[in-house]
Amino acid sequence: MNNTNLHFKNEIKKIMNYFNAGKYSIVIQKSKILLKKNSEFIPLYNIIGISLQRQKKYDEAKNIFSKGLLVDSLSLDLRLNLANTYKAVNDFVTAEKNYKKILEINPNHVLSLLNYGNLKNDLNLVDDSLSLYDRALKIDNNNFTIHFNKAFLLQSIGNFVEAIFHAKKSLEINENFTPADTLLSKMLNYKENKWHIESMVQKLKKKNLTIHNLYNLHFALGNVYEKIGNTSLSIKHIIQANEIKRKSLKHDIEDEIQLFKKIKDAFKSLNFNSLQLNEDQNHKNIIFILGMPRSGTTLVE
């Protein structure tokens, strides 16, 4: 391996480390530099696009995935990411076209079947969604995500027997996938299923749970203890779940700061003393009303 290829490979490793750390702006910046050196390296388009997705910059994500498809129109990963981006902005028609395009190329593309099934679920097309999940499971019956999504859908339509089966199957495949525990905690009768409580208590002792799985486990235990009448333990686990989830939330307020700065700058240029009312309204005062969503409060000046 020559020095150029070695440098490129090392830079990719660094970028992936930044990606895994959630430093998406750095990922985008460094990936674009590499892309200028090798515009045909398709994984870079995916890395940049997914980072933009995580930042909710969906238009930019669509653009980068589309540019990648101009380089390789048969890249299923690129087209899947493009479809998921359209789905994220509720452009279900374009998302569906891209899912169908992938499945025309490869009818057994499991991730496309899964995500297409999720889209149908979003549209409340239950039978279509279940059909796509079943197609995916015939190809990969050991995919815990498909089992969980199917369980979640079945639970929503009241088919608890099958929902419990698939939630349990999800945990058999990946016992640390605690959203399945949370789902089970809403359906099981704990007079008959004390095994699940013990399983979750033991799981809580593990050191390798992700933050996401840890707070889901606390939520599940909170549900269970509420069901069996142990209010103090229920409250304890719900509080812990909320504390963990709150710490895990990473929200960049820079966009909001810039928006408010622009609003303030715009208002600085206004001379309110020069504002004129219509002649028949001279007896009225100007009022400003500020509504604060979800606060239950409105300020009137």
PLM regions and their residue ranges:
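Alpha-helical solenoid repeat scaffolds of the TPR/TPR-like class and their adjacent stem/linker regions
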Residues: M1-E301
